[in-house]
Design a protein with these regions (language model features):
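Short cysteine/histidine-rich zinc-coordinating motifs and their immediately flanking basic loops
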Residues: 63-70
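The canonical Cys-X-X-Cys-His
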Residues: 41, 48-58, 136, 140
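Surface-exposed patches in mature extracellular/periplasmic domains of secreted proteins
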Residues: 52-53, 120-125, 148
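Glycine-rich, acidic and aromatic/proline-enriched surface loops and short helix-turn segments
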Residues: 110-114
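Electrostatic cytochrome c docking/interface patches
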Residues: 25-47, 61-63
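Ligand-binding pocket scaffold of soluble enzyme catalytic domains
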Residues: 26, 36, 55, 101, ...
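N-terminal export/targeting leaders of redox proteins
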Residues: 1-33
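Electron-transfer interface patches adjacent to heme c in soluble/periplasmic c-type cytochromes
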Residues: 49, 70-106, 124-134
Length: 148
């Protein structure tokens, strides 16, 4: 009787442990959603808005320096005609070092900086919707901050 009780006890213990382990191995929906949002932000930054073209430094051959991804860079393009407020440097975006999430979303949605100023050329005003702006901010926050 005691041997049977021991077997049942260990079987129940094994079953409970197996079930508990299977639940702990599955990522939560929130984590999965966060990963999807970050990936969507990466896609928008790298493939749609092309932020890396100005906000990532270039090497001697003109290639993007991946070790300094989105960490700010001198602007390499110049206007055909002089523009008084043309920016000479694109700020670091990796880790959002100089903007809050709300400020960054406002920049992307309205083209308005943290002090209420309009963005300087060559920065585009994207008029992004909230979901796109939020995804971009999630991606930028996921990157390590610039080390200048």
């Amino acid at each position: 009787m005691q041997a049977m009780f021991s077997r049942i006890f260990f079987f129940v213990l094994f079953l409970t442990s197996t079930i508990a382990a299977s639940f702990s191995l599955k990522p939560s929906r929130a984590v999965t959603a966060d990963k999807r949002e970050i990936e969507r932000g990466r896609y928008l930054v790298e493939e749609v808005a092309k932020c890396t073209e100005c906000h990532t430094p270039r090497g001697a051959q003109g290639q993007l320096e991946h070790e300094a991804w989105l960490q700010g860079a001198p602007i390499w393009i110049m206007p055909v005609r002089p523009i008084a407020n043309w920016a000479d440097r694109a700020p670091a975006l990796a880790g959002l070092p100089s903007l809050t999430e709300q400020e960054a979303e406002r920049v992307l949605a309205e083209g308005i900086g943290p002090e209420g100023e309009t963005l300087r050329p060559p920065m585009h005003i994207y008029h992004m919707n909230h979901e796109d702006a939020h995804a971009i901010v999630a991606y930028l926050k996921s990157l390590p901050k610039a080390v200048h």
